Amino acid sequence: FDKNAEVYNSLFRLGFGFVEVGTITPLKQYGNPKPRVFRLVEDKALINRLGFNNLGAKNVVNRIKSNSKIGLLGINIGPNKDTEDRLKDYLECLKIFHEVADYITINISSPNTEDLRSFHDQTKLNELLQMIDKEKKNLNSKTPIAVKISPDIDEQKIDKISDVLLENNVEAIIISNTSDSTRNGLTNIQRHQKGGLSGKPIEEKSTKLI
């Protein structure tokens, strides 16, 4: 919602216990072409294909520094679409945000960034989290790390992912991102739009994952 950390203090004043901003990438990017958000009223759902549109990490961190937070602020980070090194992008964002964030969310689950969900592979996820943990030690950072996962994980894979998360000093798991699953049960004319599905249609799936 608050992609560029523009209204987090206003949200705190409304009574929210915490606010998470982002997803933020190292460099500014536009995201996918518009239209990229579709409301499926009859299905009580949304489909979005925003594509990590944001102003870039340095612009956002400067905004946060000039507008002191009055509540618990999480910062959601991810790689740029055209990056040559996604691991490096996560580390760059960690370096930029660890001093201003109350926690940092590692987003590995957006269906709108090609192959991002490959980080649900046990080996790739372990490599990423080991590098995050090593960088935190280099920075002498105590900022808690959360990982945001997909609802489209099968039962065999979730056990392996859970083991990796527990082994790598991850403090929280966010369940879940939007779903890339079939839309056959939906009725709205926009149901086949490309993007991540959220809302009532994935309630059972995400709750089961919890």
Where would I find each of the regions flagged by the language model?
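Hydrophobic faces of well-ordered beta-strands that scaffold small-molecule active sites
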Residues: G17-V21, N48, L73-I77, I104-N107, ...
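Alpha-helix-loop-beta-strand connector modules within alpha/beta enzyme cores
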Residues: K44-L72, D121-V147, H192-I210
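Active-site glycine- and acidic-residue-rich loops that bind
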Residues: P79-L91, S118, K124, A146-L166
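Active-site beta-loop-alpha junctions enriched in small/polar residues
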Residues: F1-D2, I24, G78-D82, S109-P111, ...
